[in-house]
């Protein structure tokens, strides 16, 4: 089949999940990836990828997510998306030119809306679906926010024909056609040999905004080396080693870390659990991250803290519980990749059209340009 694979471009976790399943899908199907932002930077190096706009959070000077800046920065894109502006119409044409028969989307609104408008069946494959398409499992302090975000996500994305959710923790689907699998682990993670080294690994998904003076002071006061990814800084300062993005080097540092301090993304939580690395989660203010951090603490595989108010005493308390966290992780290690591939294959077969649409081929030069162009940004 000719399949579009849409990937949300905010952060790298969506791209890592896609990267783990794309090679097997491409053995059986003709795949075009549609992604923007961080995901485009990762995936375009390995797969045929069309760049699309990104709707993402914006930050204020204090490093917090800013509602006003987020609305202002995304207003033009959202208007284009919902009102079938230039970028939305171009994306529809891209789908027609490639004869797209099916969409798999990892939290990407652009490809979801395009497939809906063109009557193309959809498979949602992400983590955030656990909020929208599973029965509520939110702690009391997050209940109202969870119900709000679940309703909002369903209103924006609709109800895809099939839903596959990858998560480091279990939940109960709301309806048939929804299935859960474990974390989607990369080959590099499965091949890694974990050892308990001396260093702590710090990862911030938007560290250029999140790395603050309080966190810097706390990390410098620790009596151990700290390897830091995601800030944009480079070089060694005291016990801090600021490192550039690198898949293999990051995984080597993860496998040999004593423990992890990170924002509360699902992908890293699954990888850290598989490798037996306790997690001190410092979530963004977004509900999904706050829920993940709460679950990490509830499962006993780490603890949560406020990023802007992290103190050495918090880290010391966390480090004092590492043995218990590691023990709890042994029963939660899982790799959902094989099950995800099997489920995707079954979903694709169930949604396969009885007759294929006639493909509207674009001129070869136009196709080459489409693979590298950025969809015009109306913001």
Question: Model-predicted segments: where are they?
Answer:
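A nucleotide-sugar donor-handling region in carbohydrate enzymes
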Residues: 134, 139-209, 230-232
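A donor-sugar binding/catalytic signature common to diverse glycosyltransferases
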Residues: 102-107, 247, 252-292
